[in-house]
């Protein structure tokens, strides 16, 4: 493929699968070995909840193991690679803005003045940790990829090149790379292309396709009035505003969840290792114990900017003065947000700005799970399967699915674009996963305007949705497409291309109702995919070589009834465990305003 070469040196320790360790002529052999390695189904192990760190959507990406890759099913005999396409969340990042660190700093100042820390030493260390994580984010850039994020996407690019070596060997094939336009998404694409071996390829901003949830684009422009993209974003924003405002069902559900006795108990339990009982009880009781993200912590004061930051170069280093801590639950959740983002900042957590927020959760593992639940609830309701009988939160991703099919159709029609790589956000992946009915994204919550019990809301016991599984950092959905030359005797027309899916680089079946080409196969005819995912008519059998009349009335995938089991049989990715240990390295940093 034009432009494919070896990745540039980054100063990082080489990945065992790095293209730098594979001779150009051996890529085809490598891909063939992978293809022939196994025909069994890929079933990633389910992790034990007791070993999890409960990082919610801040879970660092876990690269596929050799066993995961070896489990990829080869294409049926006679079929060869035609195209590949991806949509991926950005990789691990630092804090998205000067918010959690600032809010806890304002709270800590009050605690220090009132003797609210258990001991002066605990207070000194707590504030030092806050100062350190702020300094690390100022140096790295708020919202920018961390070293882990760069490594995650470089590795993904390397594996994509190895898996599709035969496709990329054709110099007549082109690659298209697209970004939402947000800096961290663009950085992710750049690092992916570095791993792929095409670092000079420019990324095309596509906020219409990859930032569909907002009218305002990442660069400050707005989607053009009167366009479908603008209308879709306006409808989504209006729906979420109505649902999360007073009287909204989502607002009622999240309020019920946050006010569950367990929320208060675990928050006070966590904070009791740092603050006195009296200070915890005072949180939110009056204006002096309510903190805003401002220069003095008071409501209505000016925004604050992180010490040492250049707001012109890093506007996210300045606060949103509306953010606040109004209760012990707010304070604990703010601390939890620093704990989980620290897992994505291992290479930045070095002198002179070392920090340790994990210490506050030692012995509080079940509390961390509860905080993950609280954080997951918001994403589930606003971006995921949400409420039974509603699809507004994920139908907004329909243009992305349409684009996946467009890429295939264009290629089948003779186009030269053989690979399309898209880089976006959790706000892209979560609704796309629900639209595709991917594992864990199949069960909505009850549509109850006034929840009276846990049975009326999203709950871990009855719903499989987990942010750490659905949308970890660098989460991705990849489709590989294969084709076969000649005429299919079963149809008298050209052979229909086949598609298989990787979810976070583990091969999985398409949703229930999408019929594969053979029993036990993960490969599906593109016509069958269109039928089961979009309702398009289908005039051929979903099976290879089957001349029997097709029944295109078989229903496609639907969201399961609310409640129910945990979808464990189909949820093969398991709880993703933190498995990072990359050495600190020198790296290229690209900052964008």
Give residue ranges: language-model regions.
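Classical Sec-dependent N-terminal signal peptides that target proteins to the secretory pathway
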Residues: 32-36
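C-terminal segment of classical bacterial N-terminal signal peptides
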Residues: 37-46
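N-terminal prepro-regions of secreted/extracellular proteins
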Residues: 46, 560, 565-566, 590-593
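Signature for phosphate-centric chemistry
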Residues: 48-174, 180-420, 424-548
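Extracellular Ser/Thr-rich, low-complexity/disordered mucin-like segments
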Residues: 549-573
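A cross-kingdom C-terminal cell-surface attachment/processing module
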Residues: 567-590
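Bacterial N-terminal signal peptides that target proteins for export
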Residues: 7-31, 568
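Ala/Thr-enriched low-complexity intrinsically disordered regions
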Residues: 2, 9-10, 17, 547-548, ...
């Amino acid at each position: 493929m034009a432009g494919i070469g070896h990745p540039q040196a980054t100063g990082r320790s080489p990945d065992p699968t790095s293209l730098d360790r594979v001779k150009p002529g051996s890529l085809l052999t490598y891909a063939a070995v992978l293809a022939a390695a196994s025909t069994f189904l890929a079933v990633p192990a389910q992790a034990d909840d007791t070993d999890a760190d409960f990082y919610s959507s801040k879970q660092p990406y876990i690269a596929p193991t050799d066993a995961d890759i070896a489990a990829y099913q080869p294409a049926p005999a006679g079929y060869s690679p035609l195209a590949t396409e991806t949509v991926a969340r950005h990789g691990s990042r630092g804090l998205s803005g000067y918010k959690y660190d600032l809010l806890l700093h304002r709270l800590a100042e009050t605690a220090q003045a009132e003797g609210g820390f258990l001991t002066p030493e605990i207070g000194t260390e707590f504030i030092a940790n806050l100062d350190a994580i702020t300094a690390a984010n100022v140096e790295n850039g708020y919202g920018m990829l961390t070293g882990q994020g760069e490594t995650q996407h470089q590795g993904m690019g390397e594996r994509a090149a190895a898996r599709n070596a035969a496709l990329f060997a054709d110099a007549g094939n082109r690659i298209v790379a697209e970004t939402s336009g947000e800096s961290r998404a663009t950085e992710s694409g750049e690092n992916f292309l570095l791993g792929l071996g095409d670092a000079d390829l420019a990324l095309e901003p596509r906020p219409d396709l990859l930032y569909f949830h907002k009218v305002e684009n990442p660069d400050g422009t707005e989607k053009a009035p009167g366009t479908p993209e603008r209308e879709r974003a306006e409808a989504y924003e209006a729906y979420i505003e109505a649902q999360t405002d007073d009287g909204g069902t989502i607002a009622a559900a999240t309020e019920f969840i946050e006010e569950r006795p367990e929320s208060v108990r675990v928050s006070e339990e966590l904070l009791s290792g740092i603050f006195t009982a009296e200070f915890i009880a005072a949180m939110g009781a009056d204006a002096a114990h309510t903190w805003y993200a401002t220069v003095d912590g008071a409501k209505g004061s000016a925004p604050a900017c992180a010490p040492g930051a250049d707001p012109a170069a890093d506007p996210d280093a300045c606060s949103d003065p509306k953010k606040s801590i109004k209760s012990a639950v707010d304070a604990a959740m703010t601390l939890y947000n620093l704990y989980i983002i620290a897992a994505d900042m291992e290479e930045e957590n070095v002198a002179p700005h070392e920090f340790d927020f994990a210490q506050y959760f030692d012995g509080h593992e079940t509390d961390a799970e509860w905080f993950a639940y609280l954080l997951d609830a918001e994403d589930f309701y606003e971006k995921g399967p949400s409420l039974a009988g509603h699809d507004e939160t994920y139908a907004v991703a329909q243009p992305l699915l349409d684009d996946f099919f467009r890429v295939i159709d264009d290629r089948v029609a003779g186009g030269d674009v053989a690979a399309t790589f898209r880089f976006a956000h959790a706000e892209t992946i979560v609704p796309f996963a629900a639209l595709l009915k991917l594992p864990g994204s199949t069960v909505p919550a009850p549509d109850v305007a006034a929840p009276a019990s846990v049975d009326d809301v999203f709950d871990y016991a009855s719903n499989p949705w987990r942010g750490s599984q659905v949308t970890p950092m660098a989460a991705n959905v990849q489709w590989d497409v294969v084709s076969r030359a000649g005429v299919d005797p079963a149809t008298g027309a050209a052979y229909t291309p086949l598609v298989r899916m990787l979810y976070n680089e583990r091969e999985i079946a398409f949703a229930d109702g999408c019929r594969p080409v053979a029993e036990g196969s993960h490969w599906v005819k593109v016509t069958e995919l269109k039928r089961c995912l979009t309702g398009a008519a289908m005039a051929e059998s979903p099976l290879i070589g089957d001349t029997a009349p097709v029944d295109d009335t078989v229903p496609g995938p639907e969201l399961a009834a609310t409640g129910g089991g945990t979808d464990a049989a189909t949820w093969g990715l398991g709880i993703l465990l933190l498995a990072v240990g990359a050495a600190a390295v020198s790296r290229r940093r690209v900052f964008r305003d």
